[in-house]
């Protein structure tokens, strides 16, 4: 048994350190990293406690782009703007290069675009490619060609836990296994259609008030370049406008990732192809090209949602977790309906753009949050909501100015304005100013800020990316925010500072990265009479090495120090090793952690199955082990599996409530089979 190997605490510490040292000394690296490994260097996973669904959606979008990369020899500005890690200047520079030198012959030509830094150069090959120079179809393809030459993908994924939670024995309506099934059909960049069925562990399957099989389904048909119809989706979809003050169900990037796209908000209409049950529309949407500089975007949606109800039948809160495992959770399933319609009209000429946006939504139960709690007083209330805005901007090859100013139906104001400067090929700067009135609210507003709510915040963000030497890359930001109205755990006006500095040194096959982040916040004391500091410091050091032999290796050390009422600190050391062959690949992740409490938890990236997003955190004292393997059985079939094992040395049980596991260790197995034809 795996457990027998790790049952003793003291020997395990020595064993972990020995294994980590051996791995770091003996393993080289891989032929090519995955896009997930590059992407996680741009993440601040500690923000995911409040924005996990946003990060999951970001991951799913990148996965879709990786599955259907963009042909640089047959692309346009709108296609490149789908890539959320590119700034407006970088999109412009790539298009100018293509206009001058297309057709491209090699991906190495991207190095000629000076505004692209090493992270974009590392990410782009996963999402774009240099295709053959062939004449594009002069019009939308015929139904005969679509059905004859279209590509099909079927993917089945299952999660098997080798343990039982308390709810699996009594409390959950379903079994402990999690699984999903997805089908997608594509024809070039013209047609995409699919359906996804998914359920979480504990949810019933063809049983207990769930007669449709999976707990949740997503379905869509997307058409592009159909005459004046640039993009259209029927089914479930996501859409954005401006900088997200009125409408953004698509992206909300973290502050570190903002340094990559220089504050640009990627506003695209796209199919909702993930298992997430939050922030999507259901109905139809379209982008229509009225004339070359003028586009019209319109949408309509009607969808069921989960809600917590008050005694009088009104809705207290809208729930987006998507869990329907217990009788109480099942009673809340789709007990309320939300409708919405709206759109935007945009003008773009040269580098200038101007847009007007409006969203109207209504709910069939009056929304009545508990406003006796002061910080909820200005949460959305009522049964209908209206938000309008103007977005504006100008893009030059050296700088870009963008902004959006919005009003809700009560006249409350929200505004955000960005300035990004490409001072040289080695230096870029970004500044973001925001003011969100504490009376402003919007059901679909997700603007840049400290929290998930675009409300009760004003601040300034300053970021810099600098490459002082050929092999040295520096990034940093400082963000200050002021909240004049009480927030959760904050009973009066408060201030927040968030600062990060990251350096990356690359030399031949080696990469050394150091990161430090400090967050200085204010929260209530025990008596809620005054605010006291709530500070957090996170430091990470990592070293990676690559070689042409197919191996990969990365050694990482994390340290966390937090202060709020009491001091909590912790550390973790981890090693990731991988090998990539022409038809198969495998990776091993091993980590040892020792933290005082949940406040000093540490996040660890692990290789995941396709379309499965997790970024687990660990606290206490224990060991984490994960093994990933993938093999191409033939040109059409691919099998992937992941085995995870966690052993805690400081407790006899894991979790609380119905999630409690009556043992100190867990083992999980994930399986995935993909069939493309």
Predicted regions and their residues:
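Alpha-helical interaction/regulatory segments in DNA maintenance proteins
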Residues: 49-63, 92, 100-103, 111-148, ...
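Amphipathic, charged-and-aliphatic alpha-helical interface segments
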Residues: 55-107, 124-129, 199, 203
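Outer-membrane beta-barrel proteins
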Residues: 198-216, 270-277, 331-334, 406-408, ...
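Hydrophobic h-region of N-terminal signal peptides that target proteins for export
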Residues: 20-28
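Cleaved targeting-peptide boundary
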Residues: 30-38
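Outer membrane beta-barrel
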Residues: 212-306, 427-441, 585-598
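Transmembrane beta-strand segments of Gram-negative outer membrane beta-barrel proteins
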Residues: 141-169, 185, 189-195, 232, ...
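Exposed, low-structure sequence patches enriched in small/polar residues
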Residues: 172-176, 281, 336-369, 377-677
């Amino acid at each position: 048994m795996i457990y027998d190997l790790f049952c003793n605490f003291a020997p395990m510490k020595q064993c972990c350190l020995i294994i980590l040292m051996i791995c770091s000394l003996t393993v080289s690296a891989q032929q090519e990293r995955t896009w997930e490994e590059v992407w996680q260097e741009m993440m601040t996973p500690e923000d995911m406690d409040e924005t996990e669904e946003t990060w999951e959606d970001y991951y799913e979008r990148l996965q879709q782009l990786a599955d259907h990369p963009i042909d640089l020899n047959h692309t346009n500005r709108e296609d490149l703007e789908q890539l959320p890690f590119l700034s407006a200047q970088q999109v412009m520079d790539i298009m100018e290069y293509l206009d001058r030198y297309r057709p491209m012959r090699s991906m190495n030509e991207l190095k000629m675009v000076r505004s692209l830094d090493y992270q974009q150069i590392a990410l782009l090959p996963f999402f774009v490619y240099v295709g053959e120079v062939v004449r594009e179809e002069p019009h939308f393809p015929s139904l005969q060609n679509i059905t004859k030459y279209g590509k099909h993908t079927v993917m089945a994924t299952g999660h098997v836990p080798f343990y039982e939670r308390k709810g699996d024995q009594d409390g959950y309506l379903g079994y402990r296994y999690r699984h999903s099934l997805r089908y997608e059909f594509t024809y070039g960049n013209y047609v995409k259609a699919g359906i996804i069925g998914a359920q979480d562990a504990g949810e019933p399957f063809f049983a207990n008030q769930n007669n449709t099989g999976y707990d949740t389904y997503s379905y869509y048909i997307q058409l592009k370049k159909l005459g004046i119809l640039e993009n259209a989706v029927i089914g479930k979809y996501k859409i954005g406008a401006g900088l997200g003050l009125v409408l953004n169900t698509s992206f909300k990037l973290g502050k570190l990732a903002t340094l990559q796209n220089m504050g640009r908000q990627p506003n695209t209409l796209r199919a909702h192809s993930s298992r997430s049950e939050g922030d999507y529309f259901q109905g139809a949407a379209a982008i229509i090209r009225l004339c070359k500089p003028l586009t019209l975007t319109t949408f309509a949606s009607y969808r069921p949602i989960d809600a917590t109800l008050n005694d009088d039948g009104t809705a207290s809160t809208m729930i987006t977790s998507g869990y329907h495992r217990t009788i109480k959770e099942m009673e809340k399933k789709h007990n309320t309906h939300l409708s919405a319609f709206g759109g935007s009209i945009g003008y773009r000429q040269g580098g200038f753009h101007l847009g007007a946006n409006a969203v109207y939504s209504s709910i069939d139960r009056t929304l009545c949050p508990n406003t006796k709690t002061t910080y909820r007083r200005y949460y959305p209330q009522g049964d209908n909501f209206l938000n309008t805005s103007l977005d504006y901007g100008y893009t030059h090859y050296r700088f870009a100015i963008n902004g959006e100013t919005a009003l809700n139906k009560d006249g409350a104001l929200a505004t955000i304005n960005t300035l990004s400067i490409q001072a040289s090929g080695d230096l870029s700067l970004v500044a973001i100013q925001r003011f969100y009135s504490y009376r402003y609210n919007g059901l679909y507003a997700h603007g840049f800020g400290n929290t998930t709510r675009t409300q009760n915040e004003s601040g300034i963000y300053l970021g810099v990316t600098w490459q002082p030497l050929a092999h040295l890359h520096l990034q940093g930001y400082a963000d200050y925010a002021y909240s004049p109205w009480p927030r959760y755990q904050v009973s009066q006006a408060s201030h927040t500072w968030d600062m990060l500095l990251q350096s990356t040194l690359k030399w031949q096959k080696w990469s050394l990265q150091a990161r430090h982040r400090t967050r200085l916040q204010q929260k209530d004391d025990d008596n809620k009479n005054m605010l006291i500091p709530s500070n957090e410091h996170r430091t990470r050091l990592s070293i990676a090495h690559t070689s042409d032999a197919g191996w990969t290796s990365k050694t990482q050390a994390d340290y966390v120090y937090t202060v709020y009422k009491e001091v909590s600190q912790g550390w973790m050391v981890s090693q990731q090793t991988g090998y990539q062959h022409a038809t198969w690949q495998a990776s091993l992740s091993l980590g040892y952690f020792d933290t005082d409490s949940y406040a000093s938890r540490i996040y660890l990236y692990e290789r995941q199955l396709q379309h499965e997003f997790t970024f687990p955190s660990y606290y206490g004292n224990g060991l984490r082990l994960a093994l990933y393997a993938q093999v191409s059985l033939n040109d059409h079939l691919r099998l992937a599996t992941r085995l995870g094992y966690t052993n805690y040395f400081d407790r006899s049980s894991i979790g609380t409530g119905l999630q409690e596991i009556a043992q100190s260790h867990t083992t999980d197995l994930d399986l995935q089979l993909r069939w493309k034809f």
